[in-house]
Amino acid sequence: METAQTAPAPGSLSWKLSSHPITLLTFLFFRISSLLVYLLGMRLLSSNFVLIFIVTILLLAMDFYYLKNIAGRRLVGLRWWNEVDGATGDGRWVFESADPESREQNATDKRFFWMALYVQPVLWVVMAVVALFGFNFIWLTLVAIALVLTITNTLAFSRCDKFSQASGFASNAMYGSGLARNLAGGLVSNWFRR
């Protein structure tokens, strides 16, 4: 007796439904690998702290770069960066989002991205508590670096998503009702009446 194999529902947590499976799997690899190296190093190889520290920092840096520049753009259409004004030295964050009309978002990619983005800082906070209560203060330095990197990406992508939704709402409100067309038409006609 054969059973019919049902396909996973769209948006479910199956990498096979991803529009960019290699990007998704690489993203998940970097997200998970730094935590695993830290956990295994802290419990099994604690005598070689320097090696675990270096490998974990390298994995965190690769995760930060890959998430910021590749996974965010390909999986959810969001990107951010920091620009510094050369004259004043002031920095500002710049957020970029793909045009929602020209880019169809995959529900699976979106779900994996946001879940992994928010879960990892929580797991690093748990690691901080474990290191604190275990009196492993030297491991706490590594957790602090991990928290800075993961929280920076989490905050930046959250803001980027918020601004992309706000700009999408504003453009839909203006162009959808013809408000921008009427306003521009009125300004142009007033200009030529003078």
UniProtKB/Swiss-Prot annotation:
Alphabetic keyword roster: Glycoprotein, Golgi apparatus, Membrane, Transmembrane, Transmembrane helix
GO biological process: protein secretion; vesicle-mediated transport
Transmembrane portions of the chain: 22-42, 44-64, 112-134, 138-157
Protein name: Golgi apparatus membrane protein TVP23
GO CC terms in record: Golgi membrane
Chief localization: Golgi
UniProt function note: Golgi membrane protein involved in vesicular trafficking.
Domain of life assignment: Eukaryota
Keyword Repressor among UniProt keywords: no
Pfam families (alphabetical): DUF846
Similarity annotation: Belongs to the TVP23 family.
Residues annotated as glycosylated: N106
Native species: Phaeosphaeria nodorum (strain SN15 / ATCC MYA-4574 / FGSC 10173) (Glume blotch fungus)
Compartment list: Golgi apparatus membrane
Membrane topology, as annotated: Multi-pass membrane protein
Database matches in InterPro entries: TVP23-like (IPR008564)
